Amino acid sequence: MLTERVSKYIKKQGLVSAGDEILLAVSGGPDSVCMLYIMHKLSREMGFSLRLAHLNHGLRAEESDRDAAYVTELASALGLPLCQQKVSVKAYQAEHHLSLEEAAREMRYAFLCRTAAEFGSAAVAVGHTLDDNIETVMLHLVRGSGTRGLQGLRPVLNRTIAGAGCLRVIRPLLCLGRAETQVYCREAGLLPRQDITNLSTEPLRNRIRLEVLPLLKTINPAFEETILRTAFIAGEEMALLDEVTSQMKAELVIRQDDVLMIEKIEMQRLHPALKRNLLRQMMEELLGGLKDIEARHIENIVQTMDKPAGRRIDLPYKLVFQVDYEHYLLGWGIDELCPYPPCQGEYRLGVGTETFLDGWVVKTEILPSPIGLDLSESSLVAYLDMDKAGTDLIVRTRAEGDQFQPLGMEDAKSLKEFMIDNKIPRNWRARVPLLISSKEILWLVGYRIGESAKVDENTRRVLRVEFRLLG
């Protein structure tokens, strides 16, 4: 019996607790009407209460109004409270430049979220079935998806709705097929509404349901079971990955206003799968969801991680990812954050000592041989030819007319030009420390050493210089 199957599924998935009020999203179609009557019966057995919600999208003129009237009749017949609203999806679509399907979904979930918040509902129940799950997996495959998309619809979804809040969505009918809900309604003498737009092959989801799936079942009659099994396995794997990632995020990610920060060394240690998932969770925290965030955005961030400090990329919703000296930054207002403390005046460095500057400690030491040195140890460590660099060392920031001959270049260029070419943010440039000899710039700290003091096969002594941030 369907009611017993749904009851077992609800208990297994922990969808409802005694004392909860559940807001049922009822469109008037077979799936939502079946859900309404099954949940109404179970509410008495399991000790939860119900409230109905119906959004009239205004897309089918009088038919939409008849849908609303039918839901009103159902609520009255069962003695359940009903919240209704009529909206213009097409006006919203034009204003926000969305597809009709996207506009309807956004308005529907915003309405459900506001209604649930107004009445203190524990969750919103929607009537998605096994067939919806199969169609969703296929839709993700067609559009391009990783493992996350293969998991399809989940029994529980915590969804953040822009401008409306957070919504807990449950799907108690994911254990039933669409044909079963139709039979239930017929045997119960119910006459649910039929949406003729579901017969159109214009929307991609409809085309998959009406054309692609029937064809695939001629190739493999058990195709639907195969898809559902794949979705289950993908869901189990993603649940584990999300749990591990959440723990890492709590340990590694720091939030400062609208900017999330993580140490570069910690991020670089992570497996690529964890790295990508952590980025998704960071973006989800900032944006309240992952709408318009695609795999290519995540990959662009991953590729940018190997770039020098100051490199940045722009993301949807004016979100910015930027490489810092010791951190990766993701958020808004990053331009106002500078990793360099102010460095006023000039500081003379000793050799073989530690020197404390404004916000920095600089350690210098002489090494006997360049053999075996890791010259790419850190962007805040430089190895120089001691005899070429000399001992008359000064640290200061840029000055008007500074010239710099970067490693690998035959001629010097203006320091300003080098900073622009290397995409050093404008608000950083006046704070970047320079290591200066009596004649020239030896090192633009964090970026490039100069050509004149590079370590080569003739080097006898190596000067190691390390900058460390204080605090």
Curated annotation (Swiss-Prot):
Gene coding for it: tilS
**What is the protein name given in its UniProt record?**
tRNA(Ile)-lysidine synthase
Give the Pfam families listed for this entry.
ATP_bind_3, TilS, TilS_C
Q: What is its EC number?
A: 6.3.4.19
What main location does UniProt list?
A: cytoplasm
Provide this UniProt record's keywords sorted from A to Z: ATP-binding, Cytoplasm, Ligase, Nucleotide-binding, tRNA processing
Q: Which residues cross the membrane?
A: none
Q: Which organism is it from?
A: Dehalococcoides mccartyi (strain CBDB1)
Which family does the entry's similarity section mention?
Answer: Belongs to the tRNA(Ile)-lysidine synthase family.
Q: Which Gene3D superfamilies match?
A: 1.20.59.20, HUPs (3.40.50.620)
